Amino acid sequence: MASLVAGIDEVGRGCIAGPVIAAAVIFAPGQDTHGLADSKRLRPDRRLVLAGRICSESLAWAVGRAEVSEIDQLNILRATHLAMCRAVAALPVLPDWVRVDGNRYPPLDCPGEAIVGGDASVAEIAAASILAKVFRDREMEVLDRLCPGYALGVHKGYPTRLHIDRLASRGASFFHRRSFAPVRAVIDRSSAS
């Protein structure tokens, strides 16, 4: 088995606002990874503690992103793979093997595998899911302060009832993904008026 294994995961794929963020994490062989879990199963305060530990104790970590304009231009799958490739390219050490959460392997220059449910079963992927979630949530909270009225700090860009209601009453903003159906519907309604 390869000695340096990177885990990759993304956050924001199902959102209708904001970027998609991917993280890549490499642990030193034999490193203690106790307590890591899929970011969706952790309380926000626990995610923050673990993210700090991952950043300080992992052999290497990096974050990549795809902007709203890239998501709208490429489609969400290709934009997600772009964010993943950017995360791996930003690593200060290149991995020998990559494990990606999901069912499709991105076009990386290193070998690896896609693992469905990897965020719950592979420590490196769980760590990447935690970093990606913490980084994206922080960005959405900053965006909420810069553009109040959409409650981005609450729903983080996901298509919740609150977000859809705010989108309908306020219209789409620069951070909304125009290629996504709920946003497109609001734009179409406002242009028909």
Curated annotation (Swiss-Prot):
UniProtKB keywords: Cytoplasm, Endonuclease, Hydrolase, Manganese, Metal-binding, Nuclease
NCBIfam families named in the record: PRK00015.1-3
Name listed for the protein in its UniProt record: Ribonuclease HII
Family: Belongs to the RNase HII family.
Classification via Gene3D superfamilies: Ribonuclease H-like superfamily/Ribonuclease H
Domain RNase H type-2: 3-192
Pfam families linked: RNase_HII
Residues that span the membrane, as ranges: none
Encoding gene per record: rnhB
